[in-house]
């Protein structure tokens, strides 16, 4: 049921942000508070999230889901930010996107109290972003219970590159 509602709300744009990319815009979800709330409720049911000690949410659209879900589940929220956005000692890693390269950072001290993490993001495309967070966590002997995303782009086969459970509310 939620999948069909999301499919109706999401808009797709060809050749954005680069020629050859089909961009799925989730912005219309936020103009429909009932749908946004239903999506948060649905994602929060995931065993992946419920079995974690903390949630890591990915800059920037992942924050829109991670913050709501962490409050709903009373789980700590850790932000994976783009390079240059976090003060203090950080862990950083670079990854490839469908359309370029990017880096993510996590404040080192934010990981100290926790062992098992769930990752939240808006879209699972190539798996590069989520794998970047995984490498940051595993380099510090942390576990990943899995990842939760709003949309999974099946044609890009990211799931094959990830060695942990994935929960997606909509597959395209």
Swiss-Prot record:
> Protein name, please?
Adenine phosphoribosyltransferase
Assembly? Homodimer.
- EC numbers listed for it are 2.4.2.7
* Keywords on record: Cytoplasm, Glycosyltransferase, Purine salvage, Transferase
What InterPro entries does this protein map onto? Ade_phspho_trans, PRibTrfase_dom, PRTase-like, UPRTase/APRTase
Q: Name one GO biological process term.
A: AMP salvage
According to the UniProt record, what class of enzyme is this? transferase
- Which reactions does this protein catalyse? AMP + diphosphate = 5-phospho-alpha-D-ribose 1-diphosphate + adenine
């Amino acid at each position: 049921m939620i999948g069909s509602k999301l499919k109706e709300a999401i808009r797709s744009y060809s050749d954005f942000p680069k020629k050859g990319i089909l961009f799925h815009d989730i912005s219309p979800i936020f103009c429909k508070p009932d749908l946004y709330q239903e999506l948060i409720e649905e994602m929060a049911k995931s065993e992946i999230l419920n079995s974690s000690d903390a949630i890591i949410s990915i800059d920037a659209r992942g924050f829109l889901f991670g913050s709501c879900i962490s409050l709903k589940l009373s789980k700590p929220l850790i932000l994976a930010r783009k390079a240059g956005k976090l003060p203090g000692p950080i862990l950083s890693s670079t990854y490839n996107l469908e359309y370029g390269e990017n880096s993510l950072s996590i404040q080192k001290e934010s990981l100290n109290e926790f062992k098992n993490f769930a990752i939240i993001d808006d879209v699972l495309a190539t798996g590069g972003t989520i794998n970047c967070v995984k490498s940051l966590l595993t380099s510090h002997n942390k576990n990943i219970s899995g990842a939760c995303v709003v949309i999974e782009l099946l044609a890009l086969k990211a799931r094959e590159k990830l060695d942990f459970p994935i929960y997606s509310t909509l597959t395209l």
